[in-house]
From Swiss-Prot:
Protein name: Proline--tRNA ligase
Entry EC number(s): 6.1.1.15
Keywords, ordered alphabetically: Aminoacyl-tRNA synthetase, ATP-binding, Cytoplasm, Ligase, Nucleotide-binding, Protein biosynthesis
Coiled coil (residue ranges): none
GO MF, any single term: ATP binding
Record organism: Micrococcus luteus (strain ATCC 4698 / DSM 20030 / JCM 1464 / CCM 169 / CCUG 5858 / IAM 1056 / NBRC 3333 / NCIMB 9278 / NCTC 2665 / VKM Ac-2230)
Length: 608
């Protein structure tokens, strides 16, 4: 049976929703695919569910093709498995937590690693049972602080998550490559360009990790690529550090010297003063010769504020997002803390920090020479440095005293640090870590993420099997996710114009949109006959048979809804002609009534 717009639960809108930030959000609401229930939470209407089902079908077909089997877990999960893996705390405020009437703790699932692991533990005990690839398509919940952009950043969303269970690393590598290839096929069928890039693992843990990013200016992620093939999310880019000097070479460098540097609280002012006070022969001082020490505050679960200092070259900016990926473990806190610039109140608790003149070593105010003890750090706060601050590099940096700086302070000789972190923003033109050329930055939207989890969850939940020698071994796991609802939004973002959506045929809510643009029974009868013939050929049909709606409104709705092929039954019907229109190109041409089915089938087979 065709979908008839006279009875379809649908209301198109002429005005954009007030909260819409991106085209996909605006058009999916206006065209009647989704409706907002609350911030970050959406209801799916009949047309939206048809698109969603087609995306899910493609994902299922490709997962089944690699031997994965579908299961389905509850969304309401007990606390205990997540406590065993540490993620009850790691997720922090991102979890939706609740209690039953007896006071037992539960969560709404953000992911299901623990449940998959326990299921396999309950049922499998031998290497003969493995490998096993399991997947589900299910609703997830994350308490996003700032849900935005409609389906792109929500609190409730649908994901395909799959997990591989193998006896060893070789099996994990095979599972990873099988999923990687399946993902590329999925996105190709969805009509989405994706770029696989190196990524961090975040709260998921594990080793090898790749994101599949769809290049788009509305994407929240920045990634880089080189002409030589290096590709990575900026959070995963490793800095090319200078070669360190040995102790003898460092000892031979000139001693550090404290100088008065009036009115030099900015890097630019400091460089000007340095070139006046201590001009360097042959090459003037630049911002790259300075070491700026930035105070950052980590806000951990529960709101505790943990200030620390990070030293970076003066010509570089601190990237809080890159820092977040690694600073949690460096500070000894669980999970990824939220980072923000230190406030005046944070600085007030550490009076040794003189704003504008902070450096890695304290200053002896009487003698005027730097105190360069090997264990000194800034005011007792943890002190981390960017990889460019390598042993033997010399810097102009703050002396922790008003209008004073230290010249020639040598890293590793005159000061040490508590850790090396990727702290600075990646810039256009930076050298690729693998030497494959300069990096170019692009914006992208994360569509999928695959991880080699290794044995993290299996060890935490004691998932073991007997190997071929009868010895118990910890199972090796992989995790592979695709955002289903995000894929719908990404396709809408990619395939639209100023008139509305223009779905690729693989996911369109119908193959053909038949618009009855004449009055009387002849037009309706022709539409029913055409729809029946098209359905007999295996196509799905949406018929606009609304009796009290003008042709102009019907045409606008057809463009807004975005079915790939439109057949207009209009004035030409009296002469035995219909109009066939391609939504993507806007091209329209007349076709004879008795040749309409063949013409539509030709378009479908051509992939138009």
């Amino acid at each position: 049976m065709p979908l008839r717009m006279s009875t379809l639960f649908l209301r198109t809108l002429r005005d954009d929703p007030a909260e819409a930030e991106v085209a996909s959000h605006r058009l999916l609401v206006r065209a009647g695919y989704i409706r907002r229930a609350a911030p970050g939470i959406y209801s799916w209407l009949p047309l939206g569910l048809k698109v969603l089902a087609k995306v899910e079908r493609i994902v299922r077909e490709e997962m089944d093709a690699i031997g994965a089997q579908e299961v389905h877990f509850p969304a309401l999960l007990p606390r205990e498995p997540y406590e065993a893996t540490g993620r009850w705390d790691e997720y922090g405020d991102g979890l939706f937590r609740l209690q039953d009437r007896r006071g037992n703790d539960y969560l709404l699932a953000p992911t299901h690693e623990e449940m998959f692991t326990l299921l396999v533990k309950d049922l499998y005990s031998s290497y003969k049972d493995l490998p096993a690839y399991l997947y589900q398509i299910q609703t997830k919940y994350r308490d996003e602080a700032r849900p935005r952009a409609g389906l792109l950043r929500g609190r409730e969303f649908i994901m395909k998550d799959s997990y591989s269970f193998t006896v060893d690393d070789a099996g994990l590598d095979a599972a990873y490559e099988a999923h990687r290839a399946a993902y590329l096929r999925i996105f190709d069928r969805l009509g989405l360009e994706v770029v696989p890039v190196r990524a961090t693992s975040g709260a998921m843990g594990g080793s090898r990790s790749e994101e599949f990013l769809h290049p788009t200016e509305v994407g929240e992620d920045t990634f880089v690529e080189s002409d030589g093939g290096y590709r990575a999310n900026v959070e995963a880019v490793t800095t090319v550090a200078p070669a360190p000097l040995d102790e003898a070479a460092m000892a031979a460098l000139p001693a550090a010297e404290v100088k008065d540097t009036p009115v030099s609280t900015t890097i630019a002012a400091l460089v000007d003063v340095a070139n006046q006070l201590a001009p360097r022969e042959g090459e003037p001082w630049t911002a790259a010769d300075t070491l700026k020490c930035v105070v950052v505050t980590a806000v951990v679960d529960g709101g505790e504020r943990r200030p620390f200092v990070v030293g970076v070259p003066g010509d570089r900016e601190v990237d809080l997002k890159r820092l977040e990926a690694s600073v949690g473990s460096a500070l000894g806190v669980v999970g990824e803390p939220t980072l923000e610039a230190a406030t005046a109140a944070d600085l007030a608790e550490h009076p040794a920090l003189v704003k504008g003149y902070i450096g890695p070593a304290a200053v002896d105010a009487v003698e005027g020479t730097p105190v360069l003890g090997a264990d000194d750090s800034v005011s007792g706060l943890p002190f981390f440095v960017d990889p460019r601050i390598a042993p033997g590099t010399a810097w102009i940096t703050g002396a922790n005293a008003d209008q004073r700086h230290v010249f020639g302070l040598v890293a590793g000789r005159d000061f040490t640090w508590d850790g090396v972190l990727e702290a600075t923003a990646v810039r256009e033109g930076d050298e690729a870590p693998d030497g494959s050329g300069p990096l170019h930055t692009r914006r992208g939207m994360e569509m999928g993420h695959i991880f080699q989890l290794g044995r993290k969850y299996a060890e935490a939940l004691d998932l073991k099997v007997l190997d071929v020698h009868g010895k118990q071994v910890v199972v090796t796991m992989g995790s592979y996710g695709i955002g289903i609802t995000r894929a719908v939004a990404a396709i809408a973002e990619r395939y639209h114009d100023d008139k509305g959506l223009a779905w690729p045929r693989a996911v369109a809510p119908a193959d053909v949109h038949v618009v009855v643009a004449t009055k009387g029974e002849d037009g309706l009868a022709a539409a029913e006959t055409l729809a029946a013939s098209l359905e007999a050929e295996g196509l799905t049909v949406l018929v606009d048979d609304r009796p009290k709606v003008s042709p102009g409104v019907k045409f606008k709705d057809a463009e807004l809804i975005g079915v790939p092929t439109t057949v207009v039954i209009g004035r030409g019907l009296a002469d035995g002609e219909l109009e066939l229109k391609d939504r993507a190109t806007g091209e329209a041409r007349p076709v004879p009534v008795d040749g309409a089915v063949a013409a539509v089938l030709a378009e479908v087979r051509d992939g138009r």
